[in-house]
């Protein structure tokens, strides 16, 4: 999952990664075992006799998420998260830094199934109490209708799943997006594809806006394709915590989101990451 990959990039490469920490998969199992949730969840899941029945699926998932959110996290686990957040605050010389809390499920990267992107991410989270709550919300997001349906169809045991929550310093980006070390439009592994949009990256990941698309040749490190798409809205931080949607200024809506220099800098990081993992 992303927790281990981010840790590896932080310690073994010079690719810039926002500081942070992660709860472990063991912490998730500890939470559901110490509180008796595992047996309660097993009982609720037993009622899911027909995953194609959307009403039944939704009802079961609502109850699963509710059971998790209603259950207080064990105090020692809360204390461990609080200490890690305070250590991050000390490292960043901030009292209560704004962070992103992201889900990293142990089932994300099985060879015959793709579970990635099925759990939730929370941005601009402020204060230890909110971090603890959002970690629990990440746990609950393992049981959205979509995630449960997919695991059922894959024959994956819901109670074998575990989740690590990644807590990273929030980056208040003017532009953000995703990057691939292959051109996903045609499968060409000699090119890097970068997609970017104004604001925070969740609108790109969620398909809410159509990002700009840039293609860079790996060998020559030259920009070979630029596709600029009009963007009329973006997601930004809300003062005090959380996020909000605002209009993109009229003058910027048809402009290229990233400069050519930024695109090539990002492509350089992509090559380093690919080389580190031995993919190219």
Segments (PLM) and residue ranges:
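Short, acidic, Ser/Thr-enriched surface-loop or helix-capping motifs
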Residues: 183-184, 204
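Conserved catalytic alpha/beta cores of large enzymes that bind or transform nucleotide phosphates
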Residues: 191-280
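Short loop/turn segments at secondary-structure transitions that flank enzyme active sites
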Residues: 107, 173, 200-202
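Short conserved micro-motifs at the rims of enzyme active sites and ligand-binding pockets
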Residues: 112-113, 178, 204-206
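Segments forming glycine/polar-rich beta-alpha architectures that bind adenosine-containing cofactors
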Residues: 175-183
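N-terminal beta-alpha lobe that positions the nucleotide/phosphoryl donor
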Residues: 1-166, 175, 250-275
């Amino acid at each position: 999952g992303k927790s281990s990959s981010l840790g590896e990039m932080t310690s073994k490469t010079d690719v810039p990664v926002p500081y942070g920490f992660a709860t472990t998969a063991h912490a998730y199992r500890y939470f559901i075992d110490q509180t008796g949730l595992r047996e309660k969840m097993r009982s609720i899941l037993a009622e899911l006799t027909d995953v194609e029945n959307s009403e039944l699926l939704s009802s079961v998932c609502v109850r699963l998420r509710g059971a998790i959110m209603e259950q207080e996290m064990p105090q020692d686990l809360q204390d461990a998260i609080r200490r890690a957040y305070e250590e991050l605050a000390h490292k960043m010389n901030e009292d209560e830094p704004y962070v992103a809390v992201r889900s990293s499920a142990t089932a994300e990267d099985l060879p015959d199934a793709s579970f990635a992107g099925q759990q939730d991410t929370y941005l601009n989270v402020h204060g230890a109490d909110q971090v603890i709550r959002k970690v629990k919300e990440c746990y609950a997001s393992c049981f959205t209708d979509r995630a449960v349906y997919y695991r059922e169809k894959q024959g994956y045991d819901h109670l074998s799943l575990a989740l690590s929550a990644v807590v990273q310093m929030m980056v208040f980006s003017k532009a953000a997006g995703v990057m691939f070390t292959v051109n996903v439009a045609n499968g060409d592994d000699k090119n890097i594809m970068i997609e970017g949009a104004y604001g925070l990256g969740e609108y790109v990941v969620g398909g809410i806006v159509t990002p700009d698309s840039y293609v860079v040749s790996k060998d020559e490190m030259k920009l070979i394709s630029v596709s600029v798409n009009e963007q009329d809205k973006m997601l930004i931080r809300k003062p005090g915590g959380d996020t909000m949607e605002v209009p993109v200024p009229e003058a910027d809506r048809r402009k290229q989101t990233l400069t050519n220099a930024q695109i090539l800098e990002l492509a350089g990081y992509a090559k380093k990451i690919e080389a580190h993992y031995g993919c190219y």
